[in-house]
């Protein structure tokens, strides 16, 4: 799981205004961090299929948020893709 400090750091980096925790950029950044953490987890725990299902759910959620952002504001979409280094 994400440490509180790391989570707050990501929120501060991607927030759109003060007190923002729910904008698509923040949500995508937090989900990307969890995906990275789980990917590392699976390198050592190859048979953890139960958690792998959760990873696929998180990846799908991030994809839906990215699709939403792409359809509403392409510039913000391109900025978040570039800053997180997501292949799309």
From Swiss-Prot:
Positions of region (Disordered): 1-21
Pfam family, one: Ribosomal_S15
GO biological process: translation
GO cellular component, one term: cytosolic small ribosomal subunit
Tagged with keyword RNA-binding: yes
Keywords, ordered alphabetically: Ribonucleoprotein, Ribosomal protein, RNA-binding, rRNA-binding
PROSITE patterns associated with the record: RIBOSOMAL_S15
Alphabetized GO MF terms: rRNA binding; structural constituent of ribosome
Ribonucleoprotein is among the record's keywords: yes
Lineage top rank: taxon: Bacteria
Composition bias, Basic and acidic residues: 1-20
Stored PANTHER family: RIBOSOMAL PROTEIN S15, BACTERIAL AND ORGANELLAR (PTHR23321), SMALL RIBOSOMAL SUBUNIT PROTEIN US15M (PTHR23321:SF26)
Record's subunit section: Part of the 30S ribosomal subunit. Forms a bridge to the 50S subunit in the 70S ribosome, contacting the 23S rRNA.
Stated family: Belongs to the universal ribosomal protein uS15 family.
HAMAP family tied to this protein: Ribosomal_uS15_B
Functional note: One of the primary rRNA binding proteins, it binds directly to 16S rRNA where it helps nucleate assembly of the platform of the 30S subunit by binding and bridging several RNA helices of the 16S rRNA.
Protein known as: Small ribosomal subunit protein uS15
Native species: Syntrophotalea carbinolica (strain DSM 2380 / NBRC 103641 / GraBd1)
Lineage: Bacteria, Pseudomonadati, Thermodesulfobacteriota, Desulfuromonadia, Desulfuromonadales
